[in-house]
Amino acid sequence: MNTSQIVVMLCFIVGVAQTALAIKEDDCEVCVKTVKRFADTLDDTTKKDYKLIETAFKKFCKTQKNKEHRFCYYLGGLEESATGILNEMSKPLSWSMPAEKVCEKLKKKDAQICDLRYEKQIDLNNVDLKKLKVRDLKKILNDWDESCDGCLEKTDFIKRIEELKPKYSRNEL
């Protein structure tokens, strides 16, 4: 093999490696979805200035819960955040970089950002509540921002969920 063939092969291998390393939405789902949702809230003026993006992100973070709230904490979007790598998100967003690429950059700075995962949703129409653990029943109520005062046993939680089910379950046709 001559030198030019080796160079071509090397370039090909590097290109394949870069494609394989590219982050996918499933690899970093909370980051990608949160960045996309946040970017969709920005107006054209804000999108061009990374300082305005940072201010808007801090305001956005005040309304977030659960995994998104943790994501904001990792980035430095909350007052109680220990570290701040907010500019690693705001500057690329101001350049109109896609969410997947932004999250790829963030992952290089802090790997735990991509460790955040959404929990699997329980399909209430097809699940037997009696087979779930009390912890899962409590989680269902917590996700609905409901409480079960006086619930001590599993049957109490099931009864409360059955009462609230029509209010929260979506019937798909």
Swiss-Prot record:
Keyword Signal included in the entry's annotation: yes
Keywords (alphabetical) are: Developmental protein, Disulfide bond, Secreted, Signal
List GO terms (cellular component aspect).
endoplasmic reticulum; extracellular space; synapse
Q: What is the lineage of its organism?
A: Eukaryota, Metazoa, Ecdysozoa, Arthropoda, Hexapoda
Output one GO BP term: dopamine metabolic process
Protein name as it appears in the record: Mesencephalic astrocyte-derived neurotrophic factor homolog
Which Gene3D superfamilies does this chain map to? SAP domain, Saposin-like
What organism is the protein native to?
Answer: Drosophila mojavensis (Fruit fly)
* Listed transmembrane segments: none
Signal sequence, start to end: 1-22
Disulfide pairings: C28-C114, C31-C103, C61-C72, C148-C151
On whether S-adenosyl-L-methionine is a keyword of this UniProt record, the answer is no
Assigned protein family: Belongs to the ARMET family.
Q: Which SUPFAM superfamilies match?
A: SAP domain
Q: What does this protein do?
A: Required during the maturation of the embryonic nervous system for maintenance of neuronal and cuticular connectivity. Essential for maintenance of dopaminergic neurons and dopamine levels.
The places in or outside the cell where this protein is found are: Secreted
Please name the InterPro entries in this protein's record. Answer: ARMET-like, ARMET_C, ARMET_N, EF_Hand_1_Ca_BS, SAP_dom_sf
